[in-house]
Regions:
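Glycine-centered flexibility sites
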Residues: 4, 33, 67-68, 105-107
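Conserved RecA-like helicase motor-core motifs
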Residues: 60-70
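Helicase P-loop NTPase motor core
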Residues: 1-62, 85-89, 120-123
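Conserved short loop/turn motifs at secondary-structure junctions
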Residues: 39-44, 69, 100-102
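Conserved beta-strand termini and adjacent loop/short-helix elements that scaffold enzyme active sites
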Residues: 12, 66-68, 218
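Conserved helicase C-terminal RecA-like lobe
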Residues: 35, 49, 53-55, 59-61, ...
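Structured loop/turn residues at secondary-structure junctions
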Residues: 14, 44, 68-69, 207
Length: 226
């Protein structure tokens, strides 16, 4: 029987180079007459596909994910983005309420009440972030069950905007993972380790950006992060 083409082992320098190679090979196969829907890319773990999904999106190559959601559409990616979006834009109601509902004892109604208190606090009254979020947040009326995590949330926001300045995206992600979100993720998701790998991959990607606003803009282009 006739043999097909043998697999090729292609050494590459990094995940970005690998993604570029795979995307280029897909285009070559398409030009040879193979339909895109007949081409598949296999990978061992979801986080390994981040760069490839970005490359395919940037090149306008349509694709479907059969192993779940696209990388940037996953809940934990959007959760981390919410913290960053709130640091960049303190009047982002969607981001604030998403974060608030992660905290124990806070539901839809409590999140709405806290949002109004946040909106009317000194936190939103200046164009620049406050020197200390935690100083203001400790005065908020929160359910007793939420008090400790609410205070921790304030400390996390302090780290995202040290001395009233936005931290670089890599530092922001590290602070979010080292703060209140890690406890939430451990209690919420059964595949905690896989999601941590995703977020470590996101952190590596963020090293390309010095400005958190630019980083969030790129995420929005790639995935429509709300």
């Amino acid at each position: 029987p006739a043999r097909g083409q043998l697999p090729a082992l292609v050494p590459v320098q990094d995940p970005n180079t690998q993604a570029s190679f795979v995307a280029q090979r897909i285009l070559e196969l398409r030009d040879e007459g193979i339909e895109l829907e007949e081409i598949a890319v296999l990978y061992r773990a979801h986080y390994q596909a981040m760069e490839l999904q970005m490359e395919l999106t940037n090149r306008g190559i349509p694709f479907n994910i059969t192993s779940g959601l696209r990388f940037f559409e996953q809940a934990h990616i959007k959760d981390v983005a919410a913290f960053m979006k709130l640091a960049v834009n303190r009047k982002d109601e969607v981001a604030f309420k998403r974060i608030a509902r992660m905290l124990p004892g806070i539901g839809v109604i409590s999140a709405s009440k806290l949002w109004l208190e946040w909106l009317n606090s000194p936190i939103t009254k200046s164009d620049d972030p406050p020197i200390s979020f935690s100083e203001h947040l400790e005065k908020f009326k929160v359910p007793s069950k939420s008090k400790n995590t609410w205070i921790q949330f304030g400390y996390t926001m302090d780290e995202l905007c040290p001395d009233g300045e936005l931290a670089p995206p890599r530092e922001m992600i590290s602070s979010i993972l080292g703060g209140v979100y890690d406890d939430y993720m451990r209690s919420k998701f059964t595949n905690y380790d896989n999601r941590i790998q995703d977020l470590e991959q996101l952190k590596r990607y963020s090293e390309q950006f010095d400005d958190s606003t630019d980083f969030l803009g790129q995420l929005a282009l790639l995935s429509g992060v709300e």
